[in-house]
Amino acid sequence: MAEKPAAKPKAAAAKAEAKDQSDSYAIVEASGQQFWLQPNRYYDLDRLQAAVDDTVTLENVLLIKDGKNDTTVGQPYVKGASVELKVMDHRRGPKIIVYKMRPKKKTRRKNGHRQELTRVMVQSISIDGKALS
């Protein structure tokens, strides 16, 4: 039987690097809500006043965890921490239908609502000017 060649150190290092990046995240406060953001992923936030392809920086960072089991918790915010986002698109959420009816009164009211959203891509998470990703 032929033995499999040992894994190359570069491949193992690349896997470890990818795992470290996937383990890093930040919890930020944006538009009255808290979001768990990871680098190189996109998220839908409430509509931001920014043009497409603009860069937005969020300073209200509540928690940062890098891939090396180092967690920084703010009180209430982490000092010197920021998350850089790139605006990809402005879109609208799914339609929600609100139907109100009073029985036996012939009163019916139907309303629809679509939330205005901004799709953003997380460019980097940094603390004290040093990027984690």
UniProtKB/Swiss-Prot annotation:
SUPFAM superfamilies: L21p-like. One of its GO terms (molecular function) is structural constituent of ribosome. Signal peptide: none annotated. One of its GO terms (biological process) is translation. InterPro entries: bL21-like, bL21-like_sf, Ribosomal_bL21, Ribosomal_bL21_CS. GO terms for cellular component: cytoplasm; ribonucleoprotein complex; ribosome. It holds the Pfam family Ribosomal_L21p. Part of the 50S ribosomal subunit. Contacts protein L20. This is Large ribosomal subunit protein bL21. It comes from Prochlorococcus marinus (strain MIT 9303).
